[in-house]
Design a protein with these regions (language model features):
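Short beta-strand/loop motifs in extracellular/secreted proteins, especially
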Residues: 16, 26-28
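Conserved strand-loop elements at the edges of beta-sheets that form or border functional pockets
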Residues: 10-12, 32, 43, 53
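N-terminal edge beta-strand
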Residues: 1-15
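Extracellular/periplasmic metallocenter environments
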Residues: 2, 43-80
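Asparagine-centered strand-capping/turn motif at beta-strand->loop junctions
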Residues: 20-22
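Beta-strand-rich interaction surfaces with strong enrichment in secreted/lumenal proteins
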Residues: 5-8, 36-41, 49-50
Length: 80
């Protein structure tokens, strides 16, 4: 399991729109707890998630379905 890309660079204060596509055979979830955003995506489906990074720093994201994060489904949003 993985997110591609696993590192996303953004500018502080800029509205970001992520378009997600689940190309796997199992449901997945994108959880960005720092932004209060989470989305479950069924196999073959797409979803859009929007957020604004309020300050510079690294923000973690991951799939919260049990076992997926430890299997490598995680990443970082780098805001500058």
């Amino acid at each position: 399991f993985s997110f591609s890309p696993s590192v996303i660079n953004v500018k502080v204060g800029e509205r970001i729109k992520l378009v997600l596509k689940n190309e796997g055979q199992a449901p997945h979830n994108l959880d960005i707890s720092d932004f209060g955003e989470t989305r479950v995506i069924s196999p073959g489906e797409m979803a859009t998630l929007s957020f604004t990074a309020p300050s510079s720093g690294d923000y973690n994201f991951f799939c919260s379905i049990p076992g997926h994060e430890t299997a490598g489904m995680k990443g970082i949003i780098k805001a500058e």
